A protein has these predicted regions:
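HhH-family (HhH-GPD) DNA N-glycosylase catalytic core used in base-excision repair
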Residues: 1-230
Length: 230
């Protein structure tokens, strides 16, 4: 881990936030917010929902969020059935998310009982994103560190920054483990002193050493991955 730490020590949390805010997914949501010029909490719920079906895409994630944001510019939502009906029509017609349609619609359905609670607690959830992680994991019957659950909270934060005062990601939210992180772990782990907690412990230790919360660290790794993997 020390070699990876040495390459990342030049970055701090401000750098991470700057990287996040040039992310095409962040920019797509910011453009949507500016175009709509509204704080409708249904949009926050819609974005959480979309995050939870943002996997096994038929295109790039950045392209999908731009497509999603563009199609929302002329739409309004006032209740859960309207949100479900939107996804029921949108997913099969999407250029970038046409795979596993039935499975994804079932995931949307799971959120119905969470809808009203979420609308009441949006600001609370933004200030307590670790609580949102736990509640989403219960609703979706997934682990709190599951990639889609963590990603949903990340995207929720992206939109919420337009509405509320900026909040850092809590330190106890896990970084979403994907192929990039697995490749870096294989490259930089010390096989002579394996960690009991494996890849998760590796990144937790790196986060603490850099003093950058795990989910903010994700942005630094994303932007610098090609250099780090050399």
């Amino acid at each position: 881990m020390q070699k990876l730490y040495n390459k990342l020590i030049k970055y701090n949390i401000k750098d991470a936030i700057n990287f996040e805010e040039i992310d095409r997914q962040f920019l797509a949501l910011k453009d949507l917010y500016l175009n709509k010029k509204m704080n409708n909490k249904n949009y926050l719920f819609l974005i959480i929902t979309n995050s939870l079906i943002c996997y096994q895409l038929s295109g790039k994630g950045e392209d999908y969020w731009e497509e999603f944001s563009e199609i929302l510019e002329n739409k309004e939502f006032n209740n859960f059935p309207e949100i479900y009906n939107f996804f029921e029509k949108f997913i099969p017609e999407s250029r970038n998310n046409r795979r596993f349609i039935e499975t994804k619609l079932k995931r949307v359905s799971k959120l119905e009982n969470f809808y009203l609670e979420f609308l009441w607690k949006t600001e609370f959830y933004y200030k307590n994103m670790d609580k949102l992680i736990l509640d989403l994991s219960k609703v979706m019957n997934q682990k709190a560190d599951a990639k889609t659950i963590v990603f949903a909270v990340k995207i929720f934060s992206y939109w919420s920054r337009n509405i509320y005062d900026f909040q850092y990601f809590p330190e106890n939210i896990m970084i979403p483990i994907d192929s990039r992180l697995e490749n870096l772990y294989k490259k930089y782990e010390n096989p002579l002193t394996p960690l009991p907690g494996g890849i998760k412990e590796f990144y937790i230790n790196l986060s603490k050493k850099l003093n950058i919360p795990l989910l903010h660290l994700d942005a630094i790794v994303w932007v610098n991955y090609d250099e780090l993997i050399k």
